[in-house]
Amino acid sequence: MSSKASRLCVAALLLPLAFTGAHAQLRGHGGPVRALAISPDGTRAVSGSFDTAAILWSLTRNVAEQVMRFHDAAVNAVVFLQDGRIATAGADAHIAIWTPGKQTPDAVLDGHTGPIVDLAVSPDGKTLASASWDHSVRLWPLDGGLPRVLEGNAQNVNGVAFSPDGKEVISAGYDATVRIWKLAGDGVSVHNLPSPLNSVVIAPDGEIVAAGASGKVFFLSPGGDLRGEVEAAPTPVIQLAISPDGSLVAAAGIRGSVAVIDRKTRKLVRTLIGPGLPVWSVAFFPDGKTLLTGGTDRVIRRWNAVSGEPIDSAVVGAPEDPLKQYAGDHGAEVFRHCVACHTLTPDEGNKAGPTLWHLFGRRIATLPGYNFSPALKQLDIVWSKQTVSKLFEIGPAHYTPGTKMPEQTIGSPEERQALVDFLGRVTTK
């Protein structure tokens, strides 16, 4: 199956969506829901996924209004613009600007050289900020023109936000820094934190909230001084959301929970635990009491952020666990993080990534029918237990430069060995 055909098949699966009840969950993506945004009036949401698609949803009618297909890799960030349009950004380093109802983007913003993982709109609605793994932030004038490039991070920039007055841009990086960029000039202040950072949000009073690899949520003054911290999860926090009034912060953990924190008291109010976790994306409704979460099981759920309960616990058309037959196999559980993008059998074909059937002994970027990037085709790697283990030891971005694979490492040698042993058993039958 060609890459184009694969995308068309994914698109076909997105269209016949099913919903029940006034608060039914939203299902339609073919991979984990990586990004969420809710319109200012609370009537619409847009989601982005590892399946390379973005979906515009009506939250009043619980229907998918539009499937937006443009990106060649995971859609990592989505945002509503003040004029009603939508911006999507992906691991393909492109930003697309959409008018709802149109099948192609109004504009494509190019300039980044690595995956784009976060977007933010200035308070006046005139500028779009993007954070990228090329170690930069770019500020795009939405009325046209060249972007301003903010550089200085030593590693991936994972989060970006504007100050409430629009005079500053705040970035969070995997180099464990929060950077505050003065837009009226070239001034920047750098504030070091104890852990690599994955996300940043700004409260209406200007307080900076950042979180990352340690599982802690850090609270900084508008000037960057550390005011406090809350342990949200025992594993990395991958995304933050803040309620419109700034009273609550939601922290999505990579392995199984969403912590709801009272920003004023620095107290953990609730921990959301239920189906669909771990959570990749989270967003508050305008009421500040309701959350949307996007999970690994491809379903978007609504939660009462105050009580911690799902608003509707029924999942419509939830997919069967593709690893059910391997229950109890530790290697299969390690592989679960990869199952959204890769299949194990020839019958299942390709997903967002190529099938792993007969992986070992195959030269990188040579599987027929899959559209690999030119950069991967230049690499001299033959997949084996040793090379796959190395991939997850140092990360795809370092081992396979030019990849569109989400950045993920496995720190434990035992877990890496369990993974490659599992792949050896199930992909060579």
What feature does the model see in each segment?
Residues 45, 86-87, 128, 169, ...:
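Hydrophobic beta-strand positions that form the internal "hydrophobic ladder"
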Residues 331, 335-344, 419, 423:
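The canonical Cys-X-X-Cys-His
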Residues 25-33, 68-75, 110-116, 150-157, ...:
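WD40/WD-repeat beta-propeller blade N-cap
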Residues 48-51, 89-92, 131-134, 172-175, ...:
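Conserved strand-to-loop turn within each blade of WD40 beta-propeller repeats
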Residues 40-41, 81-83, 123-124, 164-165, ...:
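Residue-level detector of Asp-centered blade-edge/turn motifs that repeat once per structural unit
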Residues 384-429:
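C-terminal capping alpha-helices of c-type cytochrome domains
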Residues 308-334:
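Electrostatic cytochrome c docking/interface patches
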